[in-house]
Design a protein with these regions (language model features):
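Short extracytoplasmic
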Residues: 40-73
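Hydrophobic membrane-insertion alpha-helices, especially the h-region
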Residues: 5-21
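Cytosolic-side transmembrane helix boundary signature
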Residues: 1-2
Length: 237
C-alpha cells in the first residue's frame, strides 16, 4: 500500500491549485519588472557576461521575465575581465539567474525548484540546508545547495522572492502562494539563484563568494521586483 505521504502530497497540490485558481479569479496582476535593465554593477561586483538561456529551457521554464548573467568580484581580481576567468579554479565569479512569474494561477507556469531541475540535468546533490544572510535591506533566509557533476562542484544559493517576503522552503512557498492569493489577489513570484563554483578554496570560499554577492544583490532586486504598496514596516522581508 502507498504510504501516507504519497497520498497526501498530490492531494495537497490539487487543493492548492484549486484554491489559487479560485482566489485569483480577480487577480491583481503586476506590471513586469525591467530585469533587462538591472544594474551591471552591484557594489564590488561587475557584470562579466550576459548568459541567454537555450530556447528549449525557456520553453520548459515558461517564465515571464528572465535574468541570466555572470558577475565578477573586481576587488578580488582587477587584472582583466576576459572569458578565461570563467574556467579558472580560483575565479571570483558567480552566476545569477532570476526567473519571474507574473501569475501562478491554474494554467500558468510556476518556479521549478533547483532540487528538482538540477538533478534532472545530471547534477548530484552533495549537501543541502538553509543559511541566514544579513543585508542592508534586512535579514533573509536562503537555501544552500551543493551539487556535483563529474569534476565540477557548485555551491548554489536560491530563494523565492514575492511581493511581501522571501521564502527558502518549497512547501513554505506553496503555503504563502495560497495565503497571498486569498488575502491580496497576488500570485507573482521570482526564483532567485546564485551559483559559485568550488575551486581551490573549496566549498567555504565558494559559499563566501555566493553569500557576498547575494548580500549586494538582494536590496537592489527587492526594489526592482513588484511589491505591495504598503508602508515598508508592514512588509515582511
Amino acid at each position: 500500500m502507498p504510504d501516507r505521504r504519497t497520498i497526501l502530497v498530490p492531494v495537497f497540490l490539487l487543493a492548492q491549485a484549486a484554491l489559487v485558481h479560485w482566489a485569483a479569479g480577480r487577480e491583481r496582476v503586476p506590471a513586469p519588472p525591467a530585469l533587462r535593465s538591472f544594474p551591471s554593477e552591484l557594489g564590488e561586483w561587475r557584470q562579466l557576461t550576459e548568459d541567454p538561456i537555450a530556447a528549449d529551457v525557456a520553453g520548459e521554464l515558461r517564465a515571464d521575465q528572465v535574468l541570466s548573467r555572470t558577475y565578477l568580484n573586481t576587488s578580488l581580481d582587477t587584472s582583466t575581465l576576459h572569458s578565461t576567468m570563467l574556467h579558472s579554479t580560483t575565479r571570483p565569479a558567480v552566476g545569477l539567474f532570476v526567473a519571474w512569474f507574473q501569475s501562478q494561477r491554474a494554467g500558468a507556469s510556476q518556479p521549478h525548484s533547483p532540487k528538482v531541475c538540477l538533478p534532472a540535468s545530471g547534477w548530484i546533490p552533495a549537501a543541502t540546508g538553509e543559511i541566514a544572510l544579513d543585508t542592508s535591506a534586512g535579514a533573509i533566509t536562503v537555501n544552500r545547495y551543493i551539487v556535483v557533476n563529474h569534476e565540477q562542484r557548485d555551491v548554489v544559493l536560491y530563494w523565492y522572492q514575492g511581493p511581501r517576503r522571501v521564502t527558502a522552503g518549497e512547501w513554505a512557498a506553496k503555503f504563502w502562494l495560497v495565503a497571498d492569493a486569498l488575502r491580496y489577489k497576488r500570485t507573482d513570484i521570482a526564483l532567485v539563484r546564485v551559483v559559485a563554483q568550488s575551486g581551490e578554496g573549496g566549498d567555504q570560499a565558494a559559499t563566501a563568494a555566493a553569500t557576498g554577492f547575494a548580500r549586494s544583490l538582494y536590496p537592489l532586486l527587492r526594489e526592482n521586483l513588484p511589491r505591495e504598496n504598503l508602508p515598508r514596516e508592514e512588509l515582511a522581508r
